[in-house]
Amino acid sequence: NPAEGKSLLTKKQKSSGGYLIFELDEIKNIFKSEYFYEQKEQDPDYFYIILLGLVTGCRINELTSITKDQVKTSENGNRFFVIRDSKTAAGLREIPVPNKLFEFGFQKFIDKKTGNDPIFKYVNRAGKGSGNAVGKKFARHLELLKINRGKLVFHSLRKFINNFLMKKDSGVPYEPRCQFMGHEIESVNVATYTVEYSIDELSEIINPFQDKIIGLIDLKS
């Protein structure tokens, strides 16, 4: 299939002039690179931030604001984040996080943290936000790998997973995808009559796709 791994851009997205969506080959290049794995020891904050950006679609500031008490486990054993700091009302949500990430080392990373301070080291700087340092390092990461196709930034990871969940034949239905991504539901009928998914229901829908992404990048311990 010639279109496999390509971004499924709508006309609206193409004409918006916004950030581009990573293609699958670029994602594999980023997350299989030697530089990426070096960061697990050298800069674990960056390592886990971009990995979480890939599988949760969270915005930078949503991730950098997460505290230890926002990392939860449901009654059914599903792991998730409670997002309390987002730019929209729909962005305040509970997000499934694949258990594989915790097994991969993220749990040990969290266990070292104390109190209610953010689990990541990034702090707000006047006018720049806490994600500025992440964005700059991610730009250097792309430059190192010679990934220079237009406007590819950290937010492009969010666009990638949203696009991945939209696959025509095997994607996630509109309502749970909007809830996961923190998007407003545009259809008045759907928004009025849809009941919000519980975190366990949402995890059951989303986790298989997150696990598939982890498989595509061949995450190694």
For the regions a language model picked out, list residue spans one by one.
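C-terminal catalytic core of tyrosine-transesterase DNA break-rejoin enzymes
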Residues: 48-51, 55, 62, 137, ...
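Catalytic-site neighborhood detector that most strongly recognizes the C-terminal catalytic loop/helix
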Residues: 87-89, 181-217
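Basic, Lys/Arg- and aromatic-enriched nucleic-acid-binding interface segment
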Residues: 2-60
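Active-site/catalytic core of tyrosine-dependent DNA strand-transfer enzymes
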Residues: 98-149
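Exposed loop/turn and edge beta-strand positions of beta-sandwich/beta-sheet ligand-binding modules
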Residues: 46, 77, 91, 148, ...
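Conserved tyrosine-mediated DNA breakage-rejoining catalytic core shared by Y-recombinases
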Residues: 4-10, 65-105
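Short, leucine-enriched amphipathic alpha-helices that occur as contiguous helical runs
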Residues: 27, 43-47, 131, 135, ...
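Short, charged phosphate-coordinating catalytic segments
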Residues: 1-2, 53-77, 174-176
